[in-house]
């Protein structure tokens, strides 16, 4: 049998592989999430969108991402965090394909809603990385994973460059390539058994609503809402 020290070394070695992959996935997902914040101006002129239509296009990824955060977290508990992360990345890749092929407002609106899968990736990713680390490293691991939100900032620099060099379609094509690459690396380099579902976890809506009624949960939701809203 392995000693406690050996098990700790195994977890640390696993974390050294899992954390960079999870961060890379979140960087790309965050970039997809805010894609229309940069490229939306081009689409607005190309499709001759009204102010209301343009507002819907910008709001859809954020609204869907917020709506998916809790269900994705529950699904990660029930079906496994790794599986939900892979589904979210595959969904984001499908959105890039839609962006490459559509030329209508409804098509772009569907893709914008699909970009909200980035919120689901974030929820599942939190469970994925915390399952590979000890409690004494939890703060550092969560901080490193959360830093993946810098992918949203990269958009403001990289998207205009790709747009000028390759036209608008170069942007979703570049994201599609990176998404497929990260997806393949996650499949090949992570073990499904490391992120199995927890059969003892309570994931019913009733239990969730009961937990949300606690004062502490309400405070944390409020804090995160203010911080995320400011972002």
Which ranges hold each PLM region?
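Cytoplasmic helix-loop-helix junction between adjacent transmembrane helices
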Residues: 111-148
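Hydrophobic core of transmembrane alpha-helices in multi-pass small-molecule transporters
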Residues: 27, 95, 106-120, 225
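Helix-loop-helix hairpin linking two adjacent transmembrane segments in secondary transporters
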Residues: 144-190
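A generic transmembrane-helix signature of 12-TM secondary carrier transporters
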Residues: 89, 93-96, 111-112, 176-183
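Conserved MFS/SLC helix-loop-helix module at the cytosolic interface between two early adjacent transmembrane helices
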Residues: 67-105
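Juxtamembrane intracellular "pre-TM" segments in multi-pass secondary transporters
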Residues: 2-12, 193-221
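Extracytoplasmic
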Residues: 17-51, 69-72
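Residue-level signature of mid-helix packing/kink "hotspots" within the transmembrane helices
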Residues: 34, 62-70, 120, 152-154
